Amino acid sequence: MKVYECCELIRKTYAQIGGGDLGYIPNAIHCAVKTFDFIAANEELPKDVRERAAFAAANLLMSDFED
């Protein structure tokens, strides 16, 4: 997926990281899994949102890429 295919908030954050306004995290996969875990564990969110986050996290964990 390319940044231009993402929502406005992601594109804005991407630009802020690229411009030095926000910090770059070299362990991006770890950061993503932690974020998906936070979303999946939040019982206040709709079940379908939590399941999508869990699916994304599980796929990242099963991938052969390591941070």
From Swiss-Prot:
Listed InterPro entries:
UPF0253
What the entry lists under Pfam families is as follows:
UPF0253 (PF06786)
Similarity comment: family membership = Belongs to the UPF0253 family.
The record's HAMAP family line, in alphabetical order, gives:
UPF0253
Q: What is this protein called?
A: UPF0253 protein PBPRA2947
Provenance organism = Photobacterium profundum (strain SS9)
- Lineage summary: Bacteria, Pseudomonadati, Pseudomonadota, Gammaproteobacteria, Vibrionales
